[in-house]
């Protein structure tokens, strides 16, 4: 039996962490939000906040031992995972597990698990530890290729390369966008896919697994721009995606929600990536489902029941991006964005802006997917991020 409240320590306090915090507080929980800078979105609604370098093992260990939370919930990839493993051995619960957090923060480890150990279908790929190695690794894959740092987030350091002459620049971009100390890239064949999807997969304490309706999404440079739910898949495609998601999340273990990404290429379903936490493309669930991905994550973490997941006929999201470098922020056009029925705006509360930074998201639902995607696009386009 679950006894509430619980104390949750959140590692990473961005927009996803903010929604996790709100969902946790609705269940009476006490939330400590941690990040590398003060005033991060989740800190604005958390009970307590801590600013630290979460890649520093000593600092991370000290904060967790000081607060003695019931649960540690990583919300970002860049963490001192060796410290999490040590703390887990001491009896502190890490969601989903310290091992899962370590594997999924590195593209090479999650790809090796998926491809070599679990025999899931993935894009053809190779690794390179230098610009020279990258030339030899890319050639057999054919052109174009996609080059990514083994450690990065939100598409940072990712590029599409059409010929050998572009590889050195791609290597430099990958190193500039890399997190951590790994001078290594993954180079993949470029897939001419029909659709990218995220399958939100929920592992529960009793060992059962639930799935949300698939979410279609579009990215630019590896960074989410819009998403919609439910995405249109054939029965066989959905069966394949669920089977692969079940296989890899079972291997990673633990409880909570996982965002499992796939490419759809004709009849093939190809594994792409996995996040062991709520996913940015899943922000659409704040309007599309009776229980958002954040509420589902918390219910699984706290061993609370999930009787049913209901999904709207059609729902969509579109990100709101900054265009300028701004040290203080205001927003124009909110009243226009909210003038249409079944439309919502989330402004994340980030303290500053830079070109291309995600500052909010527009959400819409209705009966027709084409109509709701257009409605979300209009709402997002109405918002201007201006100097405060």
UniProtKB/Swiss-Prot annotation:
InterPro entries: ATP-grasp (IPR011761), ATP-grasp_carboxylate-amine (IPR003135), ATP_grasp_subdomain_1 (IPR013815), PreATP-grasp_dom_sf (IPR016185), PurT (IPR005862), PurT/PurK_preATP-grasp (IPR054350), PurT_C (IPR048740), Rudment_hybrid_motif (IPR011054)
UniProt GO BP: 'de novo' IMP biosynthetic process
Assigned GO CC terms: cytosol
Residues that coordinate or bind Mg(2+): 261, 273
Positions annotated to bind N(1)-(5-phospho-beta-D-ribosyl)glycinamide: 15-16, 75, 280, 350, 357-358
Catalysed reaction equations from the record: N(1)-(5-phospho-beta-D-ribosyl)glycinamide + formate + ATP = N(2)-formyl-N(1)-(5-phospho-beta-D-ribosyl)glycinamide + ADP + phosphate + H(+)
Domain of life where this protein originates: Bacteria
Family matches, as SUPFAM superfamilies: Glutathione synthetase ATP-binding domain-like, PreATP-grasp domain, Rudiment single hybrid motif
Record protein name field: Formate-dependent phosphoribosylglycinamide formyltransferase
